[in-house]
Amino acid sequence: MKAKLLVSTAFLAASVSLSAQKSATITVHADQGKEIIPKEIYGQFAEHLGSCIYGGLWVGENSDIPNIKGYRTDVFNALKDLSVPVLRWPGGCFADEYHWMDGIGPKENRPKMVNNNWGGTIEDNSFGTHEFLNLCEMLGCEPYVSGNVGSGTVEELAKWVEYMTSDGDSPMANLRRKNGRDKAWKLKYLGVGNESWGCGGSMRPEYYADLYRRYSTYCRNYDGNRLFKIASGASDYDYKWTDVLMNRVGHRMDGLSLHYYTVTGWSGSKGSATQFNKDDYYWTMGKCLEVEDVLKKHCTIMDKYDKDKKIALLLDEWGTWWDEEPGTIKGHLYQQNTLRDAFVASLSLDVFHKYTDRLKMANIAQIVNVLQSMILTKDKEMVLTPTYYVFKMYKVHQDATYLPIDLTCEKMSVRDNRTVPMVSATASKNKDGVIHISLSNVDADEAQEITINLGDTKAKKAIGEILTASKLTDYNSFEKPNIVKPAPFKEVKINKGTMKVKLPAKSIVTLELQ
């Protein structure tokens, strides 16, 4: 016998098989919260790549696409709703070929360049330092600037820092004033190179460690601005890189980056973003969850040199990486975004919350039109992705206190000797004492009856939202933009400190206890 739970949103229905319903138990330790979930865990990343900047964030003041000082109005408003905490720019691989002085001054005088990393397209530099930092001010987010170590000089990076942050009577501050900005910007996060083991210079960690020490020496703090200097860190399983940097750079850096992509491999096809089967889906869940083991191992190395955890770990590139959509430009990394990607987002964020004693920032790749993006655009049209909605549902956890949980559920063995729990969860308490719980039912076919022990919590009811779809392969298109969209969720009851949640198959829910 089957019953259907209808969720009130267009194109959204989840069939719940009551006879085959599975169960899971969770205990929320509401009295044991210690670590704050930094809002920067919900960071974004924008690179000069494909249509991320041009046509995505920026169309220029003279465009017939509605804009605010050149920034797309629809995209800007969607990002404001997301409460973006930090935005990384200009790359990525582009950062180590970017020469910042080409992107200042009158736009008609800015030289063009070939974007050799990403499709060989022409970069006109109309979006530069002023455009980026002004956007961050308008969004109310922290800028994170990645400096050029691969092909740039120490002097070039030093002058860029002075240009952005000095309020004195200095050459670069006066040049900034000449270009229309009197007051210096506040810049906290400065990356000293990017992927220096690869596109950022193909360096050995020992060599890069010396370069970091040299370049960072001349990145000075001007007029009360305090830089948080970030060294270029490892790619996923390269634990030697982290060991060498911690040993040879140590507390000369404030943070060390790490990159981890949910990708099938770096040669040949990476698979379609929209055409996949359940085996592919479960493999993806296993691969994305492997980030926990990667984080543990890098953190253990860092603990060896920094027991007090003064040096932050920053996962400043993460997310899914599929083949480009058919008919799009090779090298522009434009991919669709399905319910599968939404689960990669929710499961990854659940993991990140557990390691915030060391992990202080994460930046999903990328914000618009590239890889696992929040937003897709085409000419005047815009669509919000399933990943966008996960970030919006989860933003209640920003700067909240992480609450430890115990979770018991069924697990599945998947390809490549990985094991995937069928339920993922995270919980937090905000500054007003309100508890939020996010739940993911990874099972593609069967519902979960989840019993949550709330302890001494006085909650009497819960309200929430659910994100699901008819199929794992469902996505939002320009023709049908609301296929995967949150809807109110009411399948929850609380009685004497115990909460019962009926979680449909392949669904993500965030609850607020009241």
From Swiss-Prot:
It comes from the Bacteria. Signal peptide: none annotated. The active site is at residues 195, 317. InterPro entries: Alpha-L-AF_C, Glyco_hydro_b, Glycoside_hydrolase_SF. The record marks 321, 366 as: Important for substrate recognition. Alpha-L-arabinofuranose binds at residues 47, 194, 261, 317, 366. It holds the Pfam family Alpha-L-AF_C. Pathway: Glycan metabolism; L-arabinan degradation. Gene3D superfamilies: Glycosidases, Golgi alpha-mannosidase II. It is found in: Cytoplasm. It catalyses: Hydrolysis of terminal non-reducing alpha-L-arabinofuranoside residues in alpha-L-arabinosides. One of its GO terms (biological process) is L-arabinose metabolic process. Its main location: cytoplasm. Involved in the degradation of arabinan and is a key enzyme in the complete degradation of the plant cell wall. Catalyzes the cleavage of terminal alpha-L-arabinofuranosyl residues in different hemicellulosic homopolysaccharides (branched and debranched arabinans) and heteropolysaccharides (arabinoxylans). Belongs to the glycosyl hydrolase 51 family. Homohexamer; trimer of dimers. This is Intracellular exo-alpha-L-arabinofuranosidase. It comes from Bacteroides ovatus.
